[in-house]
Amino acid sequence: MATLGGLTHSHTLFVEDDGTPVRFYIPPGPLKRQLYQLIIHGGGEMCRLQQPGALLLSTPGSAQGAQYVSTAYVMDCVRKGELLHVDDYRLDGSHGRKRQSKGMKQDEREGESSHGSDGKEQVKVGEGPEEEDELSDLGELVIEEGLEEDEQESDTVKIKKENKMDCSEAQKIGSLKSARIHQTGRNPFTEEEDVAILVYVRDNAPHRGTVTGIALWKEMEQRRVLKRTWQAIKDRYIKHLKGKQGYRLPLSAASRSHDPSEDESPQPITKKSRTNTSTPWTKRPGNIGRTSEKLGTALPMEKSSTKAPAEQSDAVESTSINFPLEKRGQHVTKGVVRRSEGEKKSSDMSKGAVSATSKEDQEDGGDLHIFEIANMEFEVDDTPEIELPKRSLSLREFVMGEDPPSSQSQTQVDEVSSSPEDSESEGLQEALLGMMSEFKLRLRDVTQALLKNNGELSATRHFLRTGSRPDGFPIWIRKDDLDLQKADAETQKRLIQKYGSDNVAKRVAFLAS
């Protein structure tokens, strides 16, 4: 026998027959400190956390359930010096009476079996009624044990049935949830909806800025182009439609008039393609008379022409762009350009232009506009072609999209056929096309990035690749450009602190170029 004070119980008290220690768990508290010494001294283990297979100790009245074992189990094991049956101390209340220890039960069974055999022999022989009472007691004990075993089996069967019911209910709930998710999910986009999104973006994105904002998509929702929210439409375009050419879109008004649309990829511009856009022409002595005669046949064709005013304006506009003008026909060119810029164009104006050009041709020997009208009627000489140089745009005009001043377009053309500005403009265009193909961006986005980086190609590439400038300074914004034009010392000081003196100087030179 062991006492609680001296801890004289066996060191293998809480050890199973196979040598594994019995594990216990009890919430922290003074009772845990008291039981900890008893369990550790008896060879058991005290777990810091709940683990599978560990006995959950609890005081009676604090927690109830078949998984909890009363703390009296440890105290009784220490007092009796043996490992008792744990089911007798469970706090579920299903067992009516306590079972005895394993050793005592085994001894009783052996004794009962011996007494039972003796009683049977005595009954057979016909000995006294005491043996009959012992046999009846033994029979009652066997019947009670059988009833207890039947109760345990019925409990296990009930637990299995409950587990099966729980699994079936869980499967039903999961199927219902999946059905609800499938029913309440977002409807997939159809091909017609994708085409409608692409057409609307193509026709309206240039007027509303980039597609990364919300103005374009909110307007699309307000116009009820699709029966969807603007968030869903934007998400569909950004993740699935942007940059893809899988759909055949209908032609827009701009594409019918031979204007490049936004969805078409930009064609590379080379020097050869630029020089071949206009038809070369030369004049031979003696062709003026034949030209005036052919103009007489060209004028009736002009009167009987059934072209729309917009097509005639396009023809006049292409004439003014593709063919350089001579000094003698500048006043005629002014009238043609003004008519192409105006909204109202009529056939009477084109007739007046043709008659004016024919008179000018008869007075000074013919000019370029007349030769363009009767382009198919001219005889081309074998002499080398003479091309007049075109005005090259400056860096700031090309990046910011500014039109050159009208006064410069009306001045005389320089006599120099090639200049460093031409090569600079060609190199800039090739660099822009390279960045467009490298970063999969439009010309508008690349030029905006170039504008924000003072026109520096290396800094622009670094900005498009990483989102920041290589020198660590921020990119220029519109407000700072306006402040830079003010003659304010405090503003200049603030800009220098923000962008650096070198960047401020470069920005001033860039805006002035």
Curated annotation (Swiss-Prot):
The UniProt entry, under SUPFAM superfamilies, shows: Homeodomain-like
Occurrences of domain BRCT (ranges)? 1-91
Which stretches are tagged as biased composition: Polar residues? 267-281
A GO BP entry: protection from non-homologous end joining at telomere
Basic and acidic residues composition bias: residue spans: 104-124, 338-348
What subcellular locations does the record give? Nucleus; Chromosome, Telomere
Alphabetized GO MF terms: telomeric DNA binding
A Pfam family the protein falls into: Rap1_C
Q: Name one GO cellular component term.
A: nucleus
Q: Where is this region: Disordered?
A: 92-136, 248-365, 400-427
Q: Where is the Myb-like domain?
A: 186-241
Subunit structure of this entry?
A: Homodimer. Component of the shelterin complex (telosome). Interacts with terf2; the interaction is direct.
Function, in words:
Acts both as a regulator of telomere function and as a transcription regulator. Involved in the regulation of telomere length and protection as a component of the shelterin complex (telosome). Does not bind DNA directly: recruited to telomeric double-stranded 5'-TTAGGG-3' repeats via its interaction with terf2. Independently of its function in telomeres, also acts as a transcription regulator: recruited to extratelomeric 5'-TTAGGG-3' sites via its association with terf2 or other factors, and regulates gene expression.
Name of the protein described by the UniProt record:
Telomeric repeat-binding factor 2-interacting protein 1
> Which gene does this sequence derive from?
terf2ip
